[in-house]
Amino acid sequence: MASIEEIRQAQRADGPATILAIGTATPPNAIYQADYPDYYFRVTKSEHMTELKEKFRRMCDKSMIKKRYMYLTEEILKENPNLCEYMGSSLDTRQDMVVSEVPRLGKEAAVKAIKEWGQPKSKITHVIMCTTSGVDMPGADYQLTKLLGLRPSVRRFMLYQQGCFAGGTVLRLAKDLAENNKGARVLVVCSEITAICFRGPTEAALDSMVGQALFGDGAGALIVGSDPDLSIERPLFQMAWAGQTLLPDSEGAIDGHLREVGLTFHLLKDVPGIISKNITNALEEAFSPIGVSDWNNLFWIAHPGGPAILDQVEAKLGLKEEKLAATRNVLSDFGNMSSACVLFILDEMRKKSLRDGATTTGEGLDWGVLFGFGPGLTVETVVLHSVPLNC
């Protein structure tokens, strides 16, 4: 009879969790940032607030965003005017949208990841579904499983209402699942729809308007597993370590509350300062065992909460301008998609590395870091190792 130690050893994978495929998706409705202030104040019937509109225009100009994608169209907003009020009773309307749209958009990204992976979907053993856009039972994980036609016995995990750091959370969870379940293939999906938080402007809550200037819709998907079969699977990144921490003296810096008026966000002005002040500690904890202390020797995948966060992190660490290029490109092309952002940046990183003729998926470097920042203030840190590119 086998001992419990032998059973546990047999259940564990030999190698590290590895990202094997990436897929992304957005709604078809593109919003161009240069036009957005006029559009936003028109659809919310707020054009009489001329001074506030100019403040919002400056927010959009400083956002470093060129384009975002949104499920909400002008037609949908005309049919649901309660979404356009600042604090209109609207949760039922919002929930009816996101309960169906979150898994639908997630499916689009997942189908692309599964196609790139190239294996039958019956080989998926676990599903991690993540969204900050609404809640429901059975959850978006169940709906995604049904939409994709996955096995009824697939093991599901649902993460609701975690916020912008959750792209790191799902990687940390996927790492543990892949490394502790031999042969596991984990489908990870982050899907976000801003219908849960869209609202009209008010002078009384400029932090709410910052969110209106930044947030966009998108879904990202990964296939994660250990010990890849190199005859049929193509590794992209390995995960060496993952951790989470609460930053000191940061309570209330980022809050989100799901209420009858939808999801409201509240931000303190010093969020970039709090993050930049503490980021060195997070890096040292993650990389001192590896022997890396020059942060320019890493490839970078950082959640783009906004340009001020990126600017202060860059300055604090003395990063070269190109270090955050992939992050800034995603912010520019898609806006802040909450949990899905870092999955888009992973996709941008491997594609850019291939386009540029780099020797690895991490811009020619071996080691990289993925950061998620969000409510708490919570920081997720994932240590990544690139794989060689046959250019």
UniProtKB/Swiss-Prot annotation:
Catalytic residues, chain numbering: C164
EC code(s) of this entry: 2.3.1.74
Keywords of the record: Acyltransferase, Flavonoid biosynthesis, Transferase
Keyword Heme belongs to the record: no
Recorded catalytic activity of this chain's protein: (E)-4-coumaroyl-CoA + 3 malonyl-CoA + 3 H(+) = 2',4,4',6'-tetrahydroxychalcone + 3 CO2 + 4 CoA
Residues spanning the signal sequence: none
Molecular function GO labels: naringenin-chalcone synthase activity
Pathway assigned to this chain's UniProt record: Secondary metabolite biosynthesis; flavonoid biosynthesis
Gene3D superfamilies: 3.40.47.10
GO biological process, one term: polyketide biosynthetic process
Transmembrane segments: none
Family according to the record: Belongs to the thiolase-like superfamily. Chalcone/stilbene synthases family.
Task performed by this protein: The primary product of this enzyme is 4,2',4',6'-tetrahydroxychalcone (also termed naringenin-chalcone or chalcone) which can under specific conditions spontaneously isomerize into naringenin.
Protein name: Chalcone synthase
